A protein has these predicted regions:
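Charged catalytic carboxylate motif
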Residues: 1
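Secreted, luminal/periplasmic, and some membrane-associated catalytic domains
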Residues: 4-150
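Low-complexity, glycine/alanine/valine/leucine- and proline-rich hydrophobic stretches
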Residues: 135-174
């Protein structure tokens, strides 16, 4: 397709006056499973569910961004919920089996990754586990292609993981 664009510029007589930029995002990583941090939050009393598995209340909730997850507190000023959530997520990260390679506080995420939002924490994947929003069932699940976050490859990871971006620029003003 790049050749088609360049040919079209030549045919139109504008090739010598055109600047070309070829850029890419940082790509996708292959995954082998999905993990559900909300299942652990529920197990540890930070998400309350009824007998039918419906959420009745919550103090912390993970919102998936595929290979990362943003963790929100219902009341960001609730120090007890903050400490309990941070301790649980940190223990899961240290265990090395829950698909979490890093737990960022909101301040660390902003300072180190320039990521800012209403979240209290950000989870980064181990590179082969995608995060789910589910709070029911088992923590670890096999791949499920019914949701784009849980296919054989996905996005949402730190830019220094996986394939690196491409930037090629050429033309008369470059």
């Amino acid at each position: 397709w790049l050749g088609d664009i360049m040919r079209a510029c030549r045919d139109a007589g504008i090739y010598d006056d055109t600047d070309f930029f070829i850029v890419s995002d940082h790509g996708q990583l292959n995954i082998s499973r999905s993990v559900s941090p909300n299942a652990m939050l529920a197990k540890h009393g930070l998400i309350d569910v009824d007998a039918d598995g419906k959420i009745t209340d919550w103090r912390a909730f993970c919102k998936s961004a595929a290979l990362s997850s943003q963790v929100y507190l219902k009341d960001p000023n609730d120090k007890q919920a903050y400490d309990a959530t941070y301790a649980l997520l940190s223990d899961m990260c240290k265990a090395g089996i829950y698909g979490i390679s890093r737990v960022y506080t909101a301040e660390e995420a902003e300072r180190e990754e320039h990521l800012k939002g209403g979240f209290s924490f950000v989870l980064e994947s181990d590179g082969f586990s995608s995060f789910s929003n589910d709070w029911k069932g088992s923590y670890v699940r096999t791949l499920d292609n019914s949701d784009y976050r849980f296919g054989h490859a996905t996005h949402g990871h730190q830019p220094d993981k996986g394939p690196q971006p491409t930037l090629i620029a050429f033309g008369p003003d470059i």
